[in-house]
Amino acid sequence: TISAPLNLTGTTPRITSSMTFSDLTKTTTTADGIFFTAGTTQTIASGGSITLYGAASNLLSVSSSDSAVFTINFADATASYAIGYVSMSYVTASGQNILAINSTDGGNNGGITFASATSGTLRYWIATTSTTWNSTANWSTTSGGAGGSSVPTTTSDAIFDGNGNGACAIDAAASVKGLYLAGYTGTVTQNSGITV
């Protein structure tokens, strides 16, 4: 068990045994990857998080080093993730399903949904100050992008990923396909109903 946050800054790190992490992070803007030995289980502890992020022009490769499946296990519902701009293969998620944003499916994955902002189904909260849910100025089709997109609906996933940490007050009845909070340090206040 690694109880302190672990930020992997080296090139193509490999994790060769089953581990439990409080916080595991691998981010990059250049060509890079993180690899795990097949058959291992990487558990994200209660209240912990895993962050795997590449860039639009350089997806972070997340894969088994042995062309067989490894598992990312979430200990409970309080374990969280922020995963985007990755290419994943031979990964099984357990305990929670993963929404990999702007990412590609390299095959042999389970429990992972790959979504692209270009599909029009994702809405990112981008407000930097306290404001309300029901304003299009607070929503973007890309993480940290320009506001003015439609407010999330039953066909949209509302994503709070830390690229807008302003507090959000749900000021009108809302229904969304999914609600994802990962890396967000603000507060969502429910002043009206929300259906997920």
Regions found by a protein language model. Give the residues of each.
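Extracellular beta-sheet-rich ligand-binding/adhesion modules
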Residues: 1-196
